[in-house]
Each structure stands twice: as structure tokens, then as C-alpha cells.
């Protein structure tokens, strides 16, 4: 798994989902926060493989925390009716896989 590219793809999917949420009549009030966390995840994992091992672990944990934050906002959007399970499923699956890869490599 190329964590840098996967994190970038995750950030893009989060941005697309936020755009969708903003286009709906009932706008999800935490969409901006979800977008910020998605971008943080992508930026923290950028060029991860080029870093020294200690820095790599620290940045991987930072990126994993941002992924967790996105998944939390995503769950809030689903439970409050702004998204369906189906609408959230792709980003949720991507986030879970990315989080696992980041945490495994950070340990």
C-alpha cells in the first residue's frame, strides 16, 4: 500500500463528499471541519516514505488521527440523516483501510 497516494486519494474523496453535502438543501453543519480533517490526513501522509523512520511514525500517527476525525464526522452525518449508509460507505471503507495501514506502519 502506498500510504502517501492512498491518503491523497482519501483527501480527494472527502472533498468530493463535502461538496455533495454542501449542495444538499439541508447542509451538514460540520462539513468544513470534515474537509479540514481530510486535507490534514492527506498532507500529513504526503511523502511519508521519504522521511526518516522516527519522523515517519510520528507523521503516520498524525495522519491516522485526522482519518479518525473524518470517520467521526462521517458517522455524525449518517446518524443525523445528512448522508445515507450507502453514500458514506466508500469514504468509510477507504478511511478504515488507510487508518490500518498508517497505524501498522507507525508501530
Segments from the language model and where they lie:
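Amphipathic alpha-helical assembly/interaction segments
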Residues: 1-107
Amino acid at each position: 500500500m502506498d500510504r502517501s497516494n492512498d491518503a491523497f486519494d482519501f483527501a480527494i474523496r472527502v472533498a468530493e463528499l463535502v461538496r455533495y453535502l454542501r449542495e444538499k438543501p439541508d447542509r451538514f453543519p460540520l462539513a468544513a471541519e470534515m474537509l479540514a480533517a481530510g486535507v490534514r490526513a492527506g498532507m500529513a501522509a504526503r511523502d511519508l516514505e521519504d522521511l526518516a523512520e522516527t519522523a515517519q511514525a510520528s507523521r503516520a500517527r498524525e495522519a491516522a488521527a485526522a482519518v479518525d476525525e473524518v470517520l467521526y464526522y462521517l458517522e455524525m452525518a449518517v446518524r443525523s440523516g445528512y448522508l445515507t449508509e450507502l453514500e458514506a460507505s466508500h469514504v468509510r471503507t477507504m478511511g478504515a483501510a488507510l487508518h490500518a495501514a498508517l497505524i501498522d506502519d507507525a508501530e
